[in-house]
Every structure is written in structure tokens, then in C-alpha cells.
């Protein structure tokens, strides 16, 4: 039953009347909408989508993301101008990857360890269950990393990216990308470091 309130000369209603119309206040306006009863939530498509979401959330929790990785995911979410947290962006990109028939055994790069930057170089090591050689993309802007650096086998972790020819006293942003055999990619968050003064 709807609750009707009548101050001086205005009327407002909220809740549902007769299981058909719903009255509410939305963005400062009194609105009425048809009550929608959700469709069967157990269709094959919905169960598949929920399975993909569950797999993405499970991967987030078992991947062993460090504080540096989590900060990078949040930085990426901020730089992408989406109203998402790093967690939500991770889950979204993983689900999109799986929908594109990506290899579920390929994981996004993680556990990044940024070496001590010199005035013109920096080496980053990371783990990534990648079928193909990962790449790193680096730039001086949060929103544009256009320089591609091919990664090599790492010394202590699985892979490493050696950034050279950098400018002194400059903040760089980079992300890492792992690939499956069909060239579907999984990217990391947006990491950062500042080179030393010359």
C-alpha cells in the first residue's frame, strides 16, 4: 500500500500500488513507473554470465595481487575516466576477455616489482601466465602510453621489462600486457615510477 504524505499544497507518494505501479522520488522529482518483474534468472545465458563473473572474482582473490598492483588498478580506473574502482575494472576486463574466448589459463600481469630507477633506465619484473611474450607500454602521461617495450625472461620473476633511454627527473606511467595464442590480451593496472636526477 502506498504511503501518501500531504504537506501544505503538495502531495507525494512512495511504494507500490496494486503490484502494477511504483511511486518514488528520483533526482528531486516525483515519478511513477510500471513495476517490472524480473525474467527467469536461470536461463542458460544468465548462468553463463554469472559463471564468468564468478571466475573473474575468484581470480582477483587468488592472484596474489600486492599493494603496488592494487594501487596500479585504482590508478588505471582513475585514468580511464570511468566511474569504476580498480576491482570493478579488473572484473570487467576479465569477463570481456573470457567472452572473447580468451584462454582462461592466461592471467593478467601481476606481482610487479619496480627496480630502483636511474636517471635514464628502470627495470620491472613481474609474473604473468602468458602463452606469448608479454609487452610493456610506457609514457609520461596517465592517459597515453604509446612506447612499446618487448619483455624478456625475468631474473627473479617470470618476466622483466627493461625501460631505457628515459629522461631524468621524469615521472613515467606504464602497464603490462600478456597474450594468449589467439592474440587476446590481458592488461595490468597502471604503474608509475620517477627517474633519478642526472
Language-model region placement:
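Conserved aromatic anchor
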Residues: 120-132
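Short, solvent-exposed loop/linker segments at the N-terminal edge
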Residues: 114-118
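Long, polar/Ser/Thr-enriched low-complexity segments
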Residues: 1-109
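Beta-strand-rich modules
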Residues: 164-185
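Short S/T/G- and acidic-enriched coil/turn segments that sit immediately N-terminal to beta-strands
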Residues: 156-162
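Extracellular low-complexity, O-glycosylation-prone stalks/linkers
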Residues: 130-149
Amino acid at each position: 500500500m502506498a504511503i501518501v504524505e500531504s504537506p501544505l499544497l503538495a502531495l507525494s507518494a512512495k511504494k507500490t500500488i496494486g503490484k502494477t505501479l511504483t511511486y518514488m522520488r528520483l533526482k528531486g522529482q516525483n515519478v511513477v513507473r510500471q513495476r517490472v518483474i524480473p525474467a527467469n534468472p536461470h536461463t542458460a545465458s544468465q548462468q553463463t554470465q554469472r559463471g564468468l563473473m564468478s571466475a573473474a572474482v575468484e581470480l582477483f582473490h587468488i592472484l596474489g595481487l600486492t599493494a603496488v598492483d592494487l594501487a596500479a588498478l585504482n590508478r588505471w580506473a582513475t585514468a580511464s575516466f570511468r566511474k569504476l574502482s580498480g576491482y570493478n575494472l579488473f572484473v570487467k576486463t576479465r569477463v570481456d576477455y573470457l567472452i572473447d574466448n580468451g584462454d582462461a589459463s592466461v592471467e593478467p600481469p601481476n606481482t610487479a616489482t619496480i627496480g630502483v630507477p636511474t636517471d635514464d633506465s628502470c627495470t620491472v619484473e613481474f609474473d604473468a601466465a602468458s602463452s606469448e611474450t608479454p609487452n610493456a607500454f610506457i609514457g609520461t602521461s596517465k592517459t597515453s602510453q604509446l612506447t612499446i617495450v618487448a619483455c624478456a625472461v625475468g631474473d627473479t620473476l617470470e618476466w622483466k621489462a627493461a625501460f631505457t633511454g628515459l629522461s631524468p627527473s621524469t615521472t613515467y606511467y606504464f602497464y603490462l600486457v600478456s597474450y594468449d595464442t589467439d592474440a587476446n590480451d590481458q592488461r595490468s593496472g597502471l604503474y608509475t615510477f620517477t627517474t633519478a636526477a642526472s
